């Protein structure tokens, strides 16, 4: 696009190319002269790629019967444990189905059509569900490893969105750390989920919106919270759009003060750290000064506050003002909850297409697959390769791979 740097796909290395097609002119294309000289210059190159015809390798395992004269019985050699665990679909096909179900948001009907039209095989939707459940079992250990790690994190962003299970209302919670993201589906949207996942002694900073569950968790267990300033801005813009002139002016002053703080943040790379820290603290103090000073107020004959919106905003800052500025002194946490909201977007898309789950196994499968897909995206890893490695380890009764990158 105009004004944007040009991006070109890097050329395939020569070692990866299987077929070369050379073209040479026998005569000049303009005048027809046959006396042409080949130049010692590299050729123009146009590269292509194509998928081979999908060939399904079919295998058969045979166990022959033997008759034992001692016990008078027929015996068969046991099949290898990995073969029994695999069933009809071996590890790569199992990983592919799980990948399509999660990354591609494909329904079982869509996957069945893929198997029919591309692989020329027929399977039922029920069998495909069992295949995905095998992949889910393979991902249990990596998921549990992250679940146990969450209470130890120094900074977490949390959000929640609705989820349907058998027509019932559930909630998908997202916990985003620096190196990974974890999804948990629960019946409740209350603080109990935070308590179950993070415990009573969570010592990090929790980035979240202003929802009541976070308030309760914060107050019950003295948790440090960074409330989302983006949500705060939306509420302040509502004040600035009200018909009451004093309330509107109050909202506009608050917006201007917050805008000044974000201007400081945007110039972070141009400012030395001590000066940046001082500028942030000054911007914070100015916001609190505006929020708590000159708050419009008018009481009716019964002593009830008539400018309720401004009153509630000022009370929010009195009670929780500090929780909007933890990012100033806490590395790894930002002023907004955008990280968690971004992580949950593909789950919302999946919900729209697949229409939710139908029981505990389905919820567990979604939790684990979403966690793998989201974490691999953060780390620049292939979700398919991770699912394949986990499935392979599961079938072979080997330790599962980890979603935590090796450090050091």
State the predicted function of each range.
Residues 37-40, 76-79, 165-167, 183-185, ...:
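Short helix/loop capping segments that flank catalytic or ligand/cofactor-binding pockets
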Residues 211-213, 252-408:
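Acidic/histidine-rich catalytic cores and adjacent linkers
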Residues 3, 118-122, 130-217, 224:
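RNase H-like nuclease fold core
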Residues 67, 100-107, 169-182, 229-232, ...:
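Short conserved beta-strand segments at catalytic cores or DNA/RNA-binding microdomains
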Residues 35, 52-154, 373-375:
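Short, positively charged, Gly/Tyr-enriched micro-motifs
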Residues 210, 219-253:
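Conserved beta-strand -> loop -> alpha-helix junction used to position metal-binding or nucleic-acid-contacting
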Residues 28, 68, 97, 111, ...:
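Mobile genetic element proteins and their domesticated derivatives, centered on retroelements
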Residues 1-85, 158, 208:
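Short, flexible loop/hinge motifs at secondary-structure junctions
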